[in-house]
């Protein structure tokens, strides 16, 4: 499917450079300095926050164009606008449209050499980050999945960056974002004839790993297999080893609105470790002892909880692999070897038409 963009990549980049220089110039002008002295700090904070969201939107526009350069030779790329449940919180519940479903974008990648008379496995790939988005950081993973014959949908669930402040503040970490992710799955199954509804899998890292776990726990009949890499697993434990700035993202009024200390049960409800008893689907979990984001102890807690619940699953705890939190998503030989393990696990259940049998297959597919 062709994209309709006003600017090419170089044009968008030039626009961003102009905006950045304009902002820098604005901040250094005497009039702005005077305004800074006289205006209330909360109002200034709001202006800066709104400006940050505008820059995020511009960065998103640039990255959307870059997808065509990065994977356009192997994938048909689309971006679809779909809906999830209504907002978790509404400032004015009686306002017009207050209870409308939340609208969000999702990326769709379909192999170019796909035979439209056949059906193919689908992978749902939620991005990570408390507030983040799906970007060309995933280029090699998408190329590798296209080569194997997977269709991929990557939802920009509520709270993702690049879509403005209002959408950012719709975040519902471990809550309705899970249903957004599942809505992307349902949309693909219902609207794409080439998707095999009996061969749908989940794959995610970090916060995306949490979403993969929670979705497969809540909707076991809709997935054949799931992979969770370095997944956020226990929010109560996590709040204990993170700093105040991180914790404040969760206790913000538009989010959970309370600290873990004030409402332990709410944080437990949003944690995969609380729901391990629901697992019915083949699952692979990876973690790394040198992870600098999701402490290995957090994932080990999840693993032990699954064992205690008598669940069958597979896992591997890697010892001090270079790359920390991103150890299996970077471009080192070891990272690619680990991705090959993941792909072989998924292929055992999803039966893609062109599964990788060697590291050479992966490297040929993922790297130009």
Identify the role of each PLM range.
Residues 74-104, 109-198, 205, 240, ...:
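Cap/lid segment of the alpha/beta-hydrolase catalytic domain
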Residues 82-86, 157-368:
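Active-site-proximal cap/loop segments of hydrolase catalytic domains
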Residues 66, 92-93, 137-141, 212-213, ...:
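Short beta-alpha junctions and helix-cap segments that line functional grooves
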Residues 1-11:
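N-terminal secretory signal peptides that target proteins for export/translocation
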Residues 11, 17, 22-23, 27-78, ...:
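N-terminal targeting or regulatory segments adjacent to alpha/beta-hydrolase or S9 domains
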Residues 15, 23-24, 152, 329:
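Generic detector of N-terminal low-structure segments
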Residues 1, 133, 360-361:
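Bimodal feature
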């Amino acid at each position: 499917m062709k994209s309709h963009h006003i600017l090419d990549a170089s044009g968008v980049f030039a626009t961003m450079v102009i905006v950045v220089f304009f902002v820098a110039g604005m901040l250094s002008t005497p009039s702005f300095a005077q305004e800074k002295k006289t205006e209330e700090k909360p109002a200034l904070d709001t202006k800066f926050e709104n400006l940050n969201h505008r820059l995020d939107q511009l960065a998103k526009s640039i990255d959307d164009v870059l997808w065509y350069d990065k994977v356009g030779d192997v994938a048909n790329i689309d971006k679809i606008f779909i809906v999830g449940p209504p907002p978790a919180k509404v400032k004015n519940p009686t306002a017009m449209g207050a209870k409308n479903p939340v609208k969000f974008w999702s990326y769709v990648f379909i192999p170019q050499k796909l035979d439209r008379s056949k059906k193919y496995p689908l992978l749902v790939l939620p991005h990570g980050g408390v507030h983040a988005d799906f970007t060309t950081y995933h280029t090699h993973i998408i190329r590798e999945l296209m080569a194997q014959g997977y269709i991929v949908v990557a939802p920009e669930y509520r709270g993702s960056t690049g879509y403005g402040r209002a959408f950012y503040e719709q975040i519902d970490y471990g809550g309705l974002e899970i249903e957004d992710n599942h809505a992307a799955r349902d949309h693909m199954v219902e609207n794409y004839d080439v998707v095999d509804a009996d061969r749908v899998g989940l794959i995610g890292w970090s916060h995306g790993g949490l979403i993969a776990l929670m979705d497969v726990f809540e909707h076991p009949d809709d997935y054949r297999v799931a992979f969770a890499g370095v997944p956020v697993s226990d929010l109560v434990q996590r709040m204990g080893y993170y700093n105040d700035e991180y914790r404040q993202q969760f206790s913000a009024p538009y989010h959970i609105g309370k600290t873990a200390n004030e409402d332990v049960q709410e944080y437990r409800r949003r944690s995969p470790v609380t729901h391990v008893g629901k697992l019915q689907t083949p699952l692979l979990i990876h973690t790394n002892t040198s992870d600098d984001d999701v402490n290995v102890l957090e994932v080990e807690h999840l693993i032990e909880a699954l064992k205690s619940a008598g669940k069958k699953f597979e896992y591997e705890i890697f010892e001090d692999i270079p790359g920390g939190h991103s150890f299996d998503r970077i471009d080192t030989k070891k990272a690619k070897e680990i991705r090959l393990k993941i792909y072989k696990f998924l292929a055992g259940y999803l039966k893609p038409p062109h599964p990788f049998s060697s590291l050479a297959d992966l490297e040929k597919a993922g790297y130009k």
